């Protein structure tokens, strides 16, 4: 689960 998606 990605807490902060890559921009």
UniProtKB/Swiss-Prot annotation:
Compartments where located: Secreted
Keyword check for Coiled coil: no
Tissue expression summary: Expressed in the hemolymph, midgut and brain.
Domain of life: Eukaryota
Keyword entries, A-Z: Amidation, Digestion, Hormone, Neuropeptide, Secreted
One GO cellular component term noted in the UniProt record for this chain: extracellular region
GO terms of biological process kind: digestion; neuropeptide signaling pathway
Phenylalanine amide modified-residue sites: 7
Single GO molecular function: hormone activity
Membrane-spanning ranges: none
Family: Belongs to the NPY family.
Function (record text): An integral part of the sensory system that mediates food signaling, providing the neural basis for the regulation of food response; coordinates larval foraging and social behavior changes during development. May have a hormonal role in females.
The name this protein goes by in its record: Neuropeptide F
Originating species: Helicoverpa zea
């Amino acid at each position: 689960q990605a807490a902060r998606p890559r921009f």
